[in-house]
Regions:
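N-terminal leader/targeting segments and the immediate start of mature chains
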Residues: 21-67, 257-261
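C-terminal low-complexity, charged extensions that often adopt amphipathic alpha-helices
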Residues: 118, 126-154
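Gly/Pro-enriched, hydrophobic low-complexity segments
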Residues: 153-261
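An acidic-aromatic
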Residues: 80-134
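One face of beta-strands
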Residues: 52-58, 67-73, 79-85, 94, ...
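Edge/loop elements at the starts and ends of beta-strands within beta-rich repeat scaffolds
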Residues: 44-52, 64-67, 74-79, 96, ...
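Solvent-exposed loop/turn segments connecting transmembrane beta-strands
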Residues: 63-66, 86-93, 197-200, 226-231
Length: 261
């Protein structure tokens, strides 16, 4: 726990050092899909993105901090996240390499690397929000995993203005999930998860879409964990998807202090 607190302290200090929607068109111009076809298309689009590289600004707000930083992220499905946090003039302040099993977090200011096994505490310390590895992969890309809904109909399915609106209830987990999907670009614009007594627990918002590899990819992403008071907003300036020969340039210096977590 002391090491966890130390990593959180370091990341907080690093942040402290760094100080569109598509125009509306009538839905009559588009074929309205049955729910099964819609979910299949959304999930197929999500799976088209095999690799992702983006640069932009990330805004992190929790009960203990409210800061922003310039960042670069490389994602290689199914098992690699590489995040670089940069300061003024593009100076590297910190870098993290996370796979499903292991992580390395390098603090360039202290020339110290923290290595260990991936678990919920490690993920929250590095990315400052309580999400699983798979959910983080999707969060940075601006997608939502719909695999569990491929073979079951939604509890409700309606069209409101230019949005499909679907809800799914999960009695085993006592929650209900709502999705709003843009009719034109078949992209999820809003995601909400409710718990018992209709309490909002988690929500996501996605906007500023551009078609990349025939997939609508958002340049603005917001993820909020209501219960844990954690919020991340991402604004991308540049995105590349499915780039060939993508390179992750991450090597801990030979003289760095290594701390096993």
């Amino acid at each position: 726990m002391r090491k966890l607190g130390f990593i959180v302290f370091i990341l907080s200090n690093i942040f402290l050092l760094i100080t569109g929607c598509v125009p509306s068109q009538p839905t009559e111009d588009y074929e309205l899909l049955p729910s099964e076809r819609l979910i299949n298309k959304l999930e197929a689009n999500r799976r088209k993105i095999k690799s992702f590289e983006g640069t932009g600004t990330i805004f992190v707000k929790t009960a203990s901090m409210d800061n922003s930083a310039t960042f670069r992220i490389i994602l290689q499905k199914p098992d690699t996240i590489n995040l670089t946090v940069m300061g003024p003039f593009g100076i590297e302040l910190a870098q993290a390499l996370v796979t499903k099993d292991k992580f390395t977090f390098y603090d360039a200011l202290q020339n110290t690397a923290y290595v260990g096994n991936v678990n919920s505490n490690a993920m929250q310390s590095i990315f400052r929000i309580n999400l699983s590895f798979e959910d983080l992969l999707d969060a940075f890309i601006g997608s939502v995993n719909l695999t569990s809904n491929l073979y079951r109909p939604p509890d409700t399915y309606v069209v409101e203005d230019d949005k499909y609106v679907l809800t799914y209830s999960d009695s085993a987990r006592s929650n209900t999930t709502l999705y709003r999907v843009d009719v034109r670009q078949l992209a999820i614009t809003d995601y909400e998860m409710y718990g018992t007594e209709n309490q909002l627990m988690l929500k996501g918002s996605y906007s500023g879409f551009e078609l990349l590899e025939t997939v609508a990819v958002p340049y603005k992403i917001g993820i909020e964990n209501i219960l844990d008071e954690q919020k991340i907003n991402i604004e991308y300036r540049k995105i590349n998807v499915n780039k060939k020969n993508i390179v992750i340039d991450f090597k801990v210096p030979d003289d760095a202090t290594i701390i096993k977590w």
